[in-house]
């Protein structure tokens, strides 16, 4: 669904970002056999930073709370429902005039990639141990030092 905030903007740091009202993503995490694992989505090639892994997320709609936007995007991109997750803390990466909010969450029940319904923006999804991450979206990679301590 197109929103009036679906457009490119430039932040105070001179970076180009999608979402006039900012953006948000859902970072699902769990404890696996090798420690903390995160659920990442492989972005389709035609998308911004396509071919990299990151959180399901996107532009916020007008006056939309970050958690609501992250859940909406995770629903569109992976088929997740609000009842599938337990929301945790939020981490804001503020660039001046534009920000990305990462909403941390845990699965409400067992959740595997085969349980998800990917849309055209996603070409893959998987759980990854924090010490064995694939090629990451550069914005997500830059935020990892702040996010890691929040993951337990």
Question: What does each model-found stretch correspond to?
Answer:
Residues 31-33, 44-46, 92-95:
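Short polar/acidic secondary-structure junctions
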Residues 25-28, 53-61:
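Short, flexible micro-motifs
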Residues 37-38:
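Entry beta-strands of beta-propeller and related beta-repeat scaffolds
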Residues 47-51:
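A conserved beta-turn-beta hairpin within the catalytic core of GNAT-like acetyltransferases
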Residues 1-27, 31-33:
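Acidic, metal-coordinating catalytic segment for phosphate/diphosphate chemistry
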Residues 58-151:
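Unchanged
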């Amino acid at each position: 669904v197109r929103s009036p905030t679906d457009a490119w903007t430039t932040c105070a740091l001179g970076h180009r970002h999608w979402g006039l009202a900012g953006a948000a993503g859902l970072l699902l995490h769990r404890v696996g056999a090798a420690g903390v694992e995160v659920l990442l989505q492989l972005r389709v090639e035609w998308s911004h930073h396509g071919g990299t892994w990151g959180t399901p997320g996107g532009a916020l709609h007008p006056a939309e709370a970050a958690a609501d936007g992250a859940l909406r995007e995770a629903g569109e991109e992976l088929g997740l429902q609000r009842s599938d997750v337990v929301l945790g803390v939020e981490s804001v990466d503020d660039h001046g005039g534009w920000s990305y909010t990462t909403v941390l969450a845990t699965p409400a029940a067992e959740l595997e990639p085969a349980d998800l319904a990917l849309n055209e923006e996603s070409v893959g999804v998987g759980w990854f141990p924090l010490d064995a991450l694939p090629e990451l979206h550069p914005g997500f990679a830059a935020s990892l030092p702040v996010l890691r301590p929040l993951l337990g």
